[in-house]
Amino acid sequence: MAERKVRVRFAPSPTGALHIGGVRTALYNYLFARQHGGDLIFRIEDTDSNRFVPGAEEYILESFKWLGIHFDEGVSFGGEHGPYRQSERREIYKKYVQILLDNDKAYIAFDTPEELDAKRAEIANFQYDASTRGMMRNSLTMSKEEVDALIAEGKQYVVRFKIEPNEDVHVNDLIRGEVVINSSILDDKVLYKSADELPTYHLANIVDDHLMEVSHVIRGEEWLPSAPLHVLLYRAFGWEDTMPEFAHLPLLLKPEGNGKLSKRDGDRLGFPVFPLEWRPESGEVSSGYRESGYLPEAVINFLALLGWNPGNDQEVMSMDEMIKLFDIHRCSKSGAKFDYKKGIWFNHQYIQLKPNEEIAELFLPVLKEHGVEAPFEKVVTVVGMMKDRVSFIKELWDVCSFFFVAPAEYDEKTVKKRWKEDSAKCMTELAEVIAGIEDFSIEGQEKVVMDWIAEKGYHTGNIMNAFRLTLVGEGKGPHMFDISWVLGKEETLARMKRAVEVLK
């Protein structure tokens, strides 16, 4: 095949929320397109009007916007190969259906669903193919006059692809190598239905990919059984020379590895399988990665490594690094276990990598939920001290709320273990020392307090544990003088005074 511009597409159906497996497929297409200086097309495959769900298309677009996957052309992006919504391409498909009929590559069939059911009951393992089409009601067994008369009457029909029997069909897959399937196992697939004047997925898919000059079809493994049919359709149209290359991606498996990942797995184990929260008209809300507190960069990095190996030990990588390293030939043939705990690990890594200012911005709504207003500089400082302890932004409140709200009570176990008989006396003395500190920096405080402890001959651990309890309310937190420095002298003294009054 002559060298041509890389053009790939992601073509979801607007039938509901976008599954995380679909996100990975779109991501691999995006990485492949960017690496080769090519185009990524966004197409909507809405030929099945019965399954259309209002809001699904907008949901899919919003998901990619959040994730940072950008399209070059398509629905809502424009381009020279539109329209990009299949329901708007009816006349185009009709033209190509007629080409197949005129060239004896397809035929019209009038069999009703009831007649087909009767045949299935009569013949074991019945399929509509070269061995059975001669006993059915179609344009191969009827005269042209009979066919024309039925169509004129408004009789509903389908157009079926005429597959020649016993032919080896070769599919060259960039991941799996050559796949050979004998055409005898294929049925004469329905390509077009007169009832809604729309093609089925198979015809629309091939026609669109050809007219939109798609060079590579990168899609899920579930489409591999359809690949021979698609190859035969390209041949039937005489498009062998421009047929795209295929790559069928491995399935995303349940965390245990036994079967395909489903929404039920997420419900069972407590992780999302959709990029964004999904609120269908039925009212059943499904959680999303965004609303669950995942950073988009973490989701992208996590998904990229489910079925692809960059060839080194690097795990955390930016989108630019992934574009540079991505190699479709390094995608696995076998399914990838969906290790949702690894997704949490990635989120932790990206929280550490993000500037404190960005994390602080994300933490502000959490503070607001708890009725806290604080100077942004203080939030930035606290985030910098505490973000290494969390995997999600919302968890910051659990580990650092004491920076913003004085303890209303004191942890019973910590009091029993850390508050000694002389703790009230020692804390009263320490408060006087702290009140006199002029340099209230971390280092300034530490020098004065540690000198005082040494001078008094007190046990350092006992003093610092009691000091922590007065400021935090329990035995957790970062370095003691980091806490008092962030709180400031006035708040530190106020908390110490209250603790002594409550605990003495």
Swiss-Prot record:
It is an enzyme of class 6 (ligase). It comes from the Bacteria. Pfam families: Anticodon_2 (PF19269), tRNA-synt_1c (PF00749). GO terms for cellular component: cytosol. Its EC number is 6.1.1.17. It catalyses: tRNA(Glu) + L-glutamate + ATP = L-glutamyl-tRNA(Glu) + AMP + diphosphate. GO terms for biological process: glutamyl-tRNA aminoacylation. The keyword Ligase applies. InterPro entries: aa-tRNA-synth_I_cd-bd (IPR045462), aa-tRNA-synth_I_codon-bd_sub2 (IPR020751), aa-tRNA-synth_I_CS (IPR001412), aa_tRNA-synth_I_cd-bd_sf (IPR008925), Glu-tRNA-ligase_bac/mito (IPR004527), Glu/Gln-tRNA-synth (IPR000924), Glu/Gln-tRNA-synth_Ib_cat-dom (IPR020058), GluQ/Sye (IPR049940). Belongs to the class-I aminoacyl-tRNA synthetase family. Glutamate--tRNA ligase type 1 subfamily. Monomer. This is Glutamate--tRNA ligase.
